[in-house]
Amino acid sequence: MRLILLGPPGAGKGTQAQRIVEKHGIPQLSTGDMLRAAVNAGTEVGKRAKAVMDAGKLVSDEIVIAIVSERIDQPDCANGFILDGFPRTLVQADATEAMLKAKGLDLSVVIEFRVDDEELVRRVDGRYTCAQCGTVYHDTDKVPVEEGVCDKCGSTHFKRRPDDNAETMIKRLEVYYKETSPLIGYYHAKGKLRPVDGMAEIDQVTAEVEAILSKL
């Protein structure tokens, strides 16, 4: 089960990825996490990435693909994985396809989360997380059962990301539509794309996702 979750920021990809992890036992792969792990582990590609970052430059697609490739070779990915927030561009999508093909692998499905822009801005504008465990909350949609106490770990410390506001969100959407939304057509043409209604209640979205996964 090799998945890509596609959709704009705030569409609910992270929430659904976590549910897939819990139910199916496959890892969620974030490029940021993989990059940090490779650098900390001192792998060959990690050293290359560190040199680039230390110089204050952006890590190239080639290095990112190499890090993803290295991570996919780990034993916990034997039964599949979820690519979260990657690929972001058509160039990265082509490189990912080629990398998987070289391993004799193929993507199982690309799940696209469809949500209106207005709703995305509303969601992100009220979002905050537990500083301890990262559980996501929202000012109106999802507040802790006990005010000021995380449902999952009991922490009383919460934080808001500086970029979780309407102005920044609108800019992030512009980047998404310019760079990432072309992937919708790309994967549709390959017969891999499966859309879900990201406007629905979280449990309903999960049901739609599971219906897709049950057919793999």
UniProtKB/Swiss-Prot annotation:
Residues the record lists as binding Zn(2+): C130, C133, C150, C153
Gene transcribed to yield this protein: adk
GO biological process per UniProt: AMP salvage
SUPFAM superfamilies xrefs: P-loop containing nucleoside triphosphate hydrolases (SSF52540)
Cellular component, GO annotation: cytoplasm
Catalytic activity: AMP + ATP = 2 ADP
Cell compartment(s), UniProt: Cytoplasm
Residues engaged in binding ATP: G10, A11, G12, K13, G14, T15, R127, V136, Y137, A200
Official protein name in the record: Adenylate kinase
Positions that bind AMP: T31, R36, K57, L58, V59, G85, F86, P87, R88, Q92, R160, R172
Listed EC numbers: 2.7.4.3
Record's comment describing the protein's domains: Consists of three domains, a large central CORE domain and two small peripheral domains, NMPbind and LID, which undergo movements during catalysis. The LID domain closes over the site of phosphoryl transfer upon ATP binding. Assembling and dissambling the active center during each catalytic cycle provides an effective means to prevent ATP hydrolysis. Some bacteria have evolved a zinc-coordinating structure that stabilizes the LID domain.
Keywords attached to this entry: ATP-binding, Cytoplasm, Kinase, Metal-binding, Nucleotide biosynthesis, Nucleotide-binding, Transferase, Zinc
Ranges for region LID: 126-163
Job description of the protein: Catalyzes the reversible transfer of the terminal phosphate group between ATP and AMP. Plays an important role in cellular energy homeostasis and in adenine nucleotide metabolism.
Phylogenetic placement of the source organism: Bacteria, Pseudomonadati, Pseudomonadota, Alphaproteobacteria, Hyphomicrobiales
Subunit structure comment from the entry: Monomer.
